[in-house]
Swiss-Prot record:
The chain crosses the membrane at residues 15-35, 46-66, 84-104, 169-189, 196-216, 228-248. The gene is lgt. HAMAP family: Lgt. A 1,2-diacyl-sn-glycero-3-phospho-(1'-sn-glycerol) binds at residue 130. GO terms for biological process: lipoprotein biosynthetic process. It comes from Clostridium kluyveri (strain ATCC 8527 / DSM 555 / NBRC 12016 / NCIMB 10680 / K1). It is a multi-pass membrane protein. This is Phosphatidylglycerol--prolipoprotein diacylglyceryl transferase. Catalyzes the transfer of the diacylglyceryl group from phosphatidylglycerol to the sulfhydryl group of the N-terminal cysteine of a prolipoprotein, the first step in the formation of mature lipoproteins.
Length: 255
């Protein structure tokens, strides 16, 4: 699979960047629809997004480089080249949420209400962005036989044929899981729910899916023998369950 979509004056435009851009566009469209449905101010959400998204990208890169520094030790300038991949979603989520919290506090906005609205958009963007990994030939699982890969569409088979072997398309599993979670989150958001339910569901369900899918991957970031994404996902599941217990007793219901 050619990772380069086209070139302009010798400058290569890669599918990885295109898929991230499409994910952002889809996320903003869905956020606008959700704001209209609830009567929220979309402009306020955009104000937060314009600050938190760039910091999320930086966080995703920093997170990846920290755990994969051996790849950059001899050429530190490569740290700034994200066109070939190397963005960790967990880092983006942590930095993005942190930035959004600070901005929302500064602007005296309701952080929980804000992210209840935007959580479906985040997971939709992730679902689309995962296809950038497909074009880069990364975020896949181990070697599989033709009998297994033949069950997938032909373009998936071709994309997962790398250096003479077929690989398990784990990026596809996560993308589909993210779409399912997105549908669930939109449904919850548009019904009456307790404040914080949507973002809590996002953290819990995404972490649950990522925990199991990560176990199939061959390029996981590691701490010793522990997969970092599985560790963070486990923490996310625990936090989500804890917050649901809190919501059951004290959360406020919103329209």
């Amino acid at each position: 699979m050619d990772p380069i979509a086209f070139s302009i004056g010798g400058f290569q435009i890669r599918w990885y960047g295109i898929m991230i851009a499409l994910g952002v566009l889809a996320a903003l469209i869905l956020a606008n629809l959700n704001c209209r449905y609830k009567g929220y101010n979309f402009d306020s959400l955009i104000d937060v997004f314009l600050i938190s998204f760039p910091l999320a990208i930086i966080g995703a890169r920093v997170y990846y480089v920290v755990f994969q520094f051996q790849d950059y030790r001899n050429n530190l300038m490569d740290i700034f080249n994200i066109r070939l991949g190397g963005l960790a979603i967990h880092g983006g989520i942590i930095f993005g949420l942190g930035a959004a919290y600070i901005v929302s506090r500064y602007k005296k906005m309701d952080f929980i209400k804000l992210w209840d609205c935007f959580a479906p958009s985040i997971i939709l963007g992730q679902a689309i962005g995962r296809w950038g990994n497909f074009f880069n030939g990364e975020a896949h699982g181990g070697i599989v036989g033709y009998e297994f890969i033949s069950k997938f569409p032909l373009f998936i088979q071709r994309g997962m044929y790398i250096n003479g072997d077929y690989y398990n398309p784990t990026f596809l599993y996560e993308s589909l899981w993210d779409l399912i979670v997105c549908i669930i989150l939109v449904y919850i958001f548009r019904k009456k729910h307790k404040r914080g339910t949507v973002i809590c569901t996002y953290v819990g369900l995404y972490s649950l899916g990522r925990f199991f899918i990560e176990g199939l991957r061959t390029d996981s970031l590691m701490i010793g023998h522990i997969r970092v994404a599985q560790l963070v996902s486990f923490i996310g599941i625990v936090l989500s369950i804890s917050f649901f217990v809190y919501l059951k007793g004290r959360g406020k219901r919103v329209d």
